[in-house]
Structure formats: C-alpha cells, structure tokens
Amino acid sequence: MQGLFRDPALERHFTGHSGGITQLRFGPDGAQIATSSTDSTVILWNLNQAARCIRFASHSAPVNGVAWSPKGNLVASAGHDRTVKIWEPKLRGVSGEFVAHSKAVRSVDFDSTGHLMLTASDDKSAKIWRVARRQFVSSFAQQNNWVRSAKFSPNGKLVATASDDKSVRIYDVDSGECVRTFTEERAAPRQLAWHPWGNMLAVALGCNRIKIFDVSGSQLLQLYVVHSAPVNDVAFHPSGHFLLSGSDDRTIRILDLLEGRPIYTLTGHTDAVNAVAFSRDGDKFATGGSDRQLLVWQSNLHTYDASQFEAKSALASSSCESSGVSSKQSEGSSTSKSNDLSIRIDPRQSLAYQLSEENFQVLDSKHSTQPEKVLGHGMDFKQHSSSPRFF
C-alpha cells in the first residue's frame, strides 16, 4: 500500500434540479444516479459524459425518496403526494403508481430480490408491497409519529424504521413482530443504513450525532459527534469499514469504523447536505443537497492506509497549529480519539467543479394520463400503455 494512498477527489459536478435534492441512489451498474427533489421531479443522471439525462415529472408534490430495483430495470420514487411511482428507465416513462398511504410517503426501498417494495409515510406506518402482483403484503404501524425512513436488511428478513417518535424499530418480515426498539432521548432519527453484513445499523440523528447499533445484541457500538448540525443521511461503504454522512452543517464526513475516528471532512455544498450514497463497488460516492447540487466523488478508499493517514493528518495538524489555527475537537465513541485529525477537502477550486457540462442535456419525460385512484383500496397501480412524451 505504500505510495498508493490517495484522498477522495471530486469527479463530476451536476446541476439541473430547481429545488433541493432530497435523496439519491446509484444504479446497480454504477453508470447512473437517480435523484429526487423538492421540485417534484426525479432525474436519472448518466455518468457517461456523452449520454443524456432524463427528468421524470409525474409527481404533483415534492419527491422525498428514490430507489433502484436490484436489476436496475425499475426506479421507484416516494412523493409528498402520497404516491409511489414506478419508472422504467429504458421506456423513459411511468409504468405504474402505488397510492400507498394516506399521507406523504417519505422513503421507498426494494428488497434484495426486487420482488418486494417497502414504503414509509407520515401516516405513522411502513408497508411492504409485492411489486409484480401489485399487492399489499403487510404493514408495520407501532410508530406514534411520522416514519421518515424504512429499509430492508441485506438478506430481506428484517425491516428497520426511523420515526419522529424518537424510535428506531426492527421488525421481522415474516411474522410482522417488532423484535428490537432503540429509543432516542435527544432527537428523532432522520435516516438509517444497514451494514453490508446485516448485523449493524447506522442512525443519523437530529441532535448532530451518528450512532451504530448491534442489531442482534441491542447494544450501542459506536457514537460519533462529528457534525455541528443535524445529520441527514448515512451510508456504509460496501466493505463495511467506512461510513459516509451528510449534515445541515453543509459538510460530508467519512468515518473509519475500524479505528473509530473521522478521517475526512469534505466541503463544497453551500447548503445542507441531504443525501449521500456509495456506488455498489465503493469506487465512487455521491452527495446531494438543498443547494440543488449533485457532487460525484472518487472515493479512493481502496487505497486507504491507516498508518499513512496518521502521518498525513498529524502533519496537517502541525501546520495548522504553527499558523495559529487550533485543531477541532469532537466527541466520539468509546473507541474513537478525542482529536479530530480529519483531512479537510474543498473541491470548489477544482477543475471538476468549475467545468461546464458541454454534453449535458436533460430530456423531460411526462405522461399525459393521470393514474386513477380507486377508493376503498389500500393501493392503486395503473399501467400506462402509451408512449411518454418528450419536451
């Protein structure tokens, strides 16, 4: 590893939404990113510079969440209009709609097979749906307030929910029973992420903290206070060794979970960072914020070496002290160091940030027919047979 250690670096900079980005997800092949926005649209961004991007604008209210099916043939979006739209990227149109909840839908997720879909809502429930058969399967409704996020575990046997009642609950998919409850005292959880092994859960909290729990043992494993404002999103690196976070303080942090410490502080957003995600191979990560920007980064975490980082961060800290700048202090878990020796990276002067996207073009894809709502049903799914219109 000697000599190969490289810091994360900005690769691409996209703007195109007219409202803040609320969530983002890489496609399974890593060539596309789906973003949802308060401007009521979803955009599929192509990382191939010569390829066009597609904007879907079928929601009638802000879009709160987005997810890819495991095969990449479907994209689901969760709207404040109480619906979940199912998009087929190859057809560039809406293939169906779930009228899934009685209030705003906050998040959407697919299980590892792609057969089941999970939704979370302000109606205090999370629901599982069978995608192909368009059937409601089950509901988890023990929350006493909005459910901001719901995620399948990697093996699909458990569901985790984050609610404004200041709880994180773990449900057994087969039985529907709540098997674990983690209660917060300071603030409600805003987002959560399963560890790739399925045995741990990271929780982003409104009290500026990040917690990592052992799901089976109900134990708090690590606590990080590395942000100065509420934490909006967290994502595990596929290796499980690193955690990415985004906050209202406009920064992105990368944590080394093996050493229990923050290692990078990334700036570049000019407003709250609402969404973070790694690509499936971990080579890239993306961040999106209220400033409407989508930043795509080379993670370079495969080159990370703890000993080289220690030397580099110590040198940076020494330089700061010699220039009269004190190192920032941060609370951490029982395994983390008190001094935040993370390396700060600001990409706003980089070529990748300043370059205009000469080949960038967004195609608007709208469908002329509004799906019908069937009263008395928990769900309505209407297929559209005609071709979408392009503007």
From Swiss-Prot:
SMART domains: WD40. Residues 321-341, 363-391 are annotated as: Disordered. One of its GO terms (biological process) is centrosome cycle. Residues 321-338 have a biased composition (Low complexity). GO terms for cellular component: centriole; ciliary basal body. Plays an important role in centriole formation. Belongs to the WD repeat POC1 family. This is POC1 centriolar protein homolog. The gene is Poc1.
